[in-house]
Swiss-Prot record:
Keyword line: Age-related macular degeneration, Cell membrane, Cytoplasm, Disease variant, Disulfide bond, Growth factor binding, Hydrolase, Membrane, Protease, Secreted, Serine protease, Signal
Top EC class of this enzyme: hydrolase
Organism: Homo sapiens (Human)
Chain segments carrying region Serine protease: 204-364
Subcellular locations according to the entry: Cell membrane; Secreted; Cytoplasm, Cytosol
Entry protein name: Serine protease HTRA1
Chief site of localization: membrane
Assembly information from the UniProt record: Forms homotrimers. In the presence of substrate, may form higher-order multimers in a PDZ-independent manner. Interacts with TGF-beta family members, including BMP4, TGFB1, TGFB2, activin A and GDF5.
Ranges of residues in domain Kazal-like: 98-157
Catalytic residue list: H220, D250, S328
Gene Ontology MF terms in the entry: growth factor binding; identical protein binding; molecular function activator activity; serine-type endopeptidase activity; serine-type peptidase activity
Record InterPro entries: Growth_fac_rcpt_cys_sf, IGFBP-like, Kazal_dom, Kazal_dom_sf, PDZ, PDZ_6, PDZ_sf, Peptidase_S1_PA
Lineage: Eukaryota, Metazoa, Chordata, Craniata, Vertebrata
UniProt keyword Signal present: yes
Amino acid sequence: MQIPRAALLPLLLLLLAAPASAQLSRAGRSAPLAAGCPDRCEPARCPPQPEHCEGGRARDACGCCEVCGAPEGAACGLQEGPCGEGLQCVVPFGVPASATVRRRAQAGLCVCASSEPVCGSDANTYANLCQLRAASRRSERLHRPPVIVLQRGACGQGQEDPNSLRHKYNFIADVVEKIAPAVVHIELFRKLPFSKREVPVASGSGFIVSEDGLIVTNAHVVTNKHRVKVELKNGATYEAKIKDVDEKADIALIKIDHQGKLPVLLLGRSSELRPGEFVVAIGSPFSLQNTVTTGIVSTTQRGGKELGLRNSDMDYIQTDAIINYGNSGGPLVNLDGEVIGINTLKVTAGISFAIPSDKIKKFLTESHDRQAKGKAITKKKYIGIRMMSLTSSKAKELKDRHRDFPDVISGAYIIEVIPDTPAEAGGLKENDVIISINGQSVVSANDVSDVIKRESTLNMVVRRGNEDIMITVIPEEIDP
């Protein structure tokens, strides 16, 4: 008689379930069962655990009970118990112990699975992690704090792993390490009108371009200051002399007298810069020396005319690296560590500008020629503001960001008023828009610069919020 297929189905399921149930009974044990081990672990049958174990705790041969493991260097592999935490049983020639080895009656030693040194929280260096754990167990037995791992490698030294991700891909850190020694912090002082006491009024950044102490920075950083002090990365300070200034380009050259050769930065070719390149800005914002920010090049040729500077021949580098007054004058560098610009201007978050290195080269060449020919540098007039020309598109953008922005579409927008300057004394404030001077309409920042050169008194009308305010500013004549 033939048995129907449907009747065979329950029998088939029972046969499939049998090995599964056997596997479940040994759950929690990944190793093959040793001889004499029960089919199912019963924790209630485990012997009492000792309070202290020299080698740490481990599972017995059956994988059921926690027992004291053998310490590092102890025998293992025959009748001895398992090795302790982090240890493995190794027979001569470094072969891990196995069932085959045990059957051949070969004994082994408990060896730490980790061979590199580690530094403990007790300031001691241990040959491996197992020795540190043993020290921690001894410490706890004496009712002292446990010893924890602080770092790989010996105490007091780093662990250099050339194959680690941070070692392979931290190219920004490599650039900073290369350029930082040649970046300087600049502190500026002025004398008080009545007491003649000098007070610090501002700070900025610069970078060394010659081994004998020539330093490039922004013109607005050093102009109208009675004393300029330069601090190197090693903390040494020097008095600096202003050698040359180009206010239109906003580049200045200062010099310190230093014995010995100084580290220098080389200028790259800004004309070869591409949008999307990584750049690093370094400087001293808020007097925090060697502060690093990173970003990409947004565009390589943001023309001064696009910024509303009608008579400007400057093509700025636009970047989203953070630039502010403190790191003005510091270098903007590429990943080769070459200077491709001077940090100079921040319009708003994510929109900053740098003077291209090709302009710096031109300035340094012309400065060398002037000094070689002995030409005197004439005094210049200064009021102490940083400004940009306002256009309808920029006015709309600023109004979207600042609800109280004035309802104007042209003029000179004041980005910053430098402390202790004629502009501050006259009452100008950040975000003011200059709309006329001495009865003449102001359309761009160049209009303001032209009037400053010609006039000794500036009667300004500025738009502040929704009000027009009359302000008088008297420019100062300064040594560039």
